[in-house]
Amino acid sequence: MAKYNEKKEKKRIAKERIDILFSLAERVFPYSPELAKRYVELALLVQQKAKVKIPRKWKRRYCKKCHAFLVPGINARVRLRQKRMPHIVVKCLECGHIMRYPYIKEIKKRRKEKMEY
């Protein structure tokens, strides 16, 4: 039982550190984008070592290819597309990598809320 609690505690600490590193990257980005990139890389190392998932709010804020911290309008272009399946297109302006995130769940949720009224 002690090993289970110890493992759980390590994962909690890792998630906390990931959150701290990403919030530091967000705060320091306007002054030093390279330092923000380093914070993202450190957060990814912590995540890999502890085998935990990065929270969704941070997962979409860095480039999967060059690990740059993405800020829409500065080093990332964000577009909404409806073709085939509704999705968000995020293009990293540092390396040119394109990431697509579907948002069907959000649309279904909105429809459901509309039907309830």
Swiss-Prot record:
GO terms for molecular function: ribonuclease P activity; zinc ion binding. Its cofactor is Zn(2+). The keyword Zinc applies. Its EC number is 3.1.26.5. Zn(2+) binds at residues 63, 66, 92, 95. Its main location: cytoplasm. Changing residue 14 to V: 3-fold reduced binding to Rnp1. GO terms for cellular component: cytoplasm; ribonuclease P complex. It catalyses: Endonucleolytic cleavage of RNA, removing 5'-extranucleotides from tRNA precursor. GO terms for biological process: tRNA 5'-leader removal. Binds 1 zinc ion per subunit. It is found in: Cytoplasm. Keywords: Cytoplasm, Endonuclease, Hydrolase, Metal-binding, Nuclease, tRNA processing, Zinc. Part of ribonuclease P, a protein complex that generates mature tRNA molecules by cleaving their 5'-ends. The RNA is catalytic, but its KM for pre-tRNA is 170-fold decreased in the presence of the 4 known protein subunits (Rnp1-4). The protein subunits also decrease the amount of Mg(2+) needed for activity. Belongs to the eukaryotic/archaeal RNase P protein component 4 family. Consists of a catalytic RNA component and at least 4 protein subunits. Forms a subcomplex with Rnp1 which stimulates the catalytic RNA. This is Ribonuclease P protein component 4. It comes from Pyrococcus furiosus (strain ATCC 43587 / DSM 3638 / JCM 8422 / Vc1). The lineage of its organism: Archaea, Methanobacteriati, Methanobacteriota, Thermococci, Thermococcales.
